[in-house]
Amino acid sequence: MAAARSCNGYARREGPPSPKLGTEKPRVSAGSGGSGDGWRGERPRSEEDNELSLPSLAAAYTTILRALGEDPERQGLLKTPWRAATAMQFFTKGYQETIADVLNDAIFDEDHDEMVIVKNIDMFSLCEHHLVPFVGKVHIGYLPNKQVLGLSKLARIVEIYSRRLQVQERLTKQIAIAITEALQPAGVGVVIEATHMCMVMRGVQKMNSKTATSTMLGVFREDPKTREEFLTLIRS
């Protein structure tokens, strides 16, 4: 069972066209789960915030255990609230980082004008509806416009946005917009294929279901041949 919702086997997300030189860059809209101020936005959470909020977060897990009918004082659960609290802070550590942190020294002038693709980037995130994981692969391609990005930084972009409370559709779009804002390329394509534990462990309980989403910007959206080349290469 696949939850793909589109042509070419992938769900297409509507998004703004790729910016051209001299035009205003697109921004991640407020309330979209991003920084609210594009790829240079402020961190919504700091290390100090983590330290200050850890006791209340652990106390919340203690309350959850009691509400489930468990005894937080029994041996196996004595440290569970603190373990769960620190784990949740790690699962959402993307709130402590911005794209500017990793991209400022990794954008290089380069005349390469053919497609750049990094595929099968491992992704782990938390569904914001049920707070259970969804995991999968991210495939990214872009057509440079005089600038390229260090390849490992594409994986870092995925890490920053996936380590937050997310929905897959928004995550796909945020990755594409971040690359577009940073490089102003001729186009960007992002495809995510993921398994959602909220569909596996609860609800319809379909073990083999996968959801595929995509965001195509610039020539990847406007030119069917460019889009098809990208989709063919990530499938190969």
Swiss-Prot record:
Region (Disordered): 1-52
Chain segments annotated as transmembrane: none
Protein EC: 3.5.4.16
Record family assignment: Belongs to the GTP cyclohydrolase I family.
Reaction catalysed by this enzyme: GTP + H2O = 7,8-dihydroneopterin 3'-triphosphate + formate + H(+)
Species of provenance: Gallus gallus (Chicken)
Name of a matching Pfam family: GTP_cyclohydroI
Pathway: Cofactor biosynthesis; 7,8-dihydroneopterin triphosphate biosynthesis; 7,8-dihydroneopterin triphosphate from GTP: step 1/1
Function (record text): May positively regulate nitric oxide synthesis in endothelial cells. May be involved in dopamine synthesis. May modify pain sensitivity and persistence.
Enzyme class: hydrolase
Protein name (database record): GTP cyclohydrolase 1
Domain of life: Eukaryota
Record keywords: Allosteric enzyme, Cytoplasm, GTP-binding, Hydrolase, Metal-binding, Nucleotide-binding, Nucleus, Tetrahydrobiopterin biosynthesis, Zinc
